[in-house]
């Protein structure tokens, strides 16, 4: 069954709503420029409330590797999501399992993926100004091509309760990732949208 990650969690209430709705993973944004930024101490308190089989994912953008490793240990993250311009050499310095994000404009954006050793590959829409969380989608044919190349794809970018089922049917990804598509405001989740998104994703195939 498709896995679902709800990203940009900033409160215990939103975390528990997502868990109760069936989320497989929750994302915590440690990038200070993001409207969904959370301090590690706050994230750790929320993560301590999670049941054992819900994975905590920490999102970082061009952060020093030693900081990533320290936050990962302190928060007991299950996965580190690198959403910036991190190189394969950088990724090898991360102690925890890595999911690298690639911002997609064309098929050529898939070429560097083979150079990385990672647990998963997140495909997001390209923006010249933002590292994810834009609410924009991209051509899902590119994501489907990535699947045919044998990559474990986590599909992100412009997903909503209304389009997630079709996205899953077209791409057949390992997982889907949503942030702005289930929000009432940046960093504030809409409980009804969260429930609808997860339900539609889980029932898509």
From Swiss-Prot:
Report the GO molecular function annotations: phosphoribosylanthranilate isomerase activity
Which InterPro entries does the record match to this protein? Aldolase_TIM (IPR013785), PRAI_dom (IPR001240), RibuloseP-bd_barrel (IPR011060), TrpF_fam (IPR044643)
The keyword Lipoprotein is assigned to this record: no
The record's section on Pfam families has: PRAI (PF00697)
Name the keywords, alphabetized. Answer: Amino-acid biosynthesis, Aromatic amino acid biosynthesis, Isomerase, Tryptophan biosynthesis
The EC number of this protein is 5.3.1.24
Pathway the protein acts in: Amino-acid biosynthesis; L-tryptophan biosynthesis; L-tryptophan from chorismate: step 3/5
Amino-acid biosynthesis is among the record's keywords: yes
Coiled-coil ranges (or none): none
A GO biological process this protein is involved in? Answer: L-tryptophan biosynthetic process
What does the record give as the reaction this protein catalyses? N-(5-phospho-beta-D-ribosyl)anthranilate = 1-(2-carboxyphenylamino)-1-deoxy-D-ribulose 5-phosphate
Q: Which family does the record assign?
A: Belongs to the TrpF family.
Q: Which NCBIfam families match?
A: PRK01222.1-4 (NF002298)
Protein name as annotated: N-(5'-phosphoribosyl)anthranilate isomerase
Name of the gene encoding the protein in the UniProt record: trpF
């Amino acid at each position: 069954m498709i896995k679902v990650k709800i990203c940009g969690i900033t409160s215990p209430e939103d975390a528990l709503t997502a868990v109760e709705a069936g989320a497989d993973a929750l994302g915590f944004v440690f990038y200070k420029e993001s409207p969904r930024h959370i301090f590690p101490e706050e994230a750790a308190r929320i993560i301590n409330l999670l049941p054992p089989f819900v994975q905590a994912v920490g999102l970082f953008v061009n952060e020093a590797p030693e900081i990533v490793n320290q936050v990962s240990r302190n928060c007991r993250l299950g996965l580190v999501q690198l959403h910036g311009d991190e190189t394969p050499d950088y990724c090898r310095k991360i102690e925890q399992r890595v999911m690298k994000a690639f911002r997609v404009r064309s098929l050529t954006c898939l070429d560097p993926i083979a150079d990385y050793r990672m647990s998963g590959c997140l495909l997001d829409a390209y923006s010249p100004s933002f590292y994810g969380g834009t609410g924009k989608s991209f051509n899902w044919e590119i994501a489907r091509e990535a699947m045919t190349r044998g990559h474990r794809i986590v599909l992100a970018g412009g997903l909503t309760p209304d389009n997630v089922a079709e996205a899953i049917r077209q791409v057949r990804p390992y997982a889907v990732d949503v942030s702005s598509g289930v929000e009432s405001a940046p960093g504030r989740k809409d409980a009804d949208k969260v429930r609808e998104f997860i339900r539609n994703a889980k029932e898509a195939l």
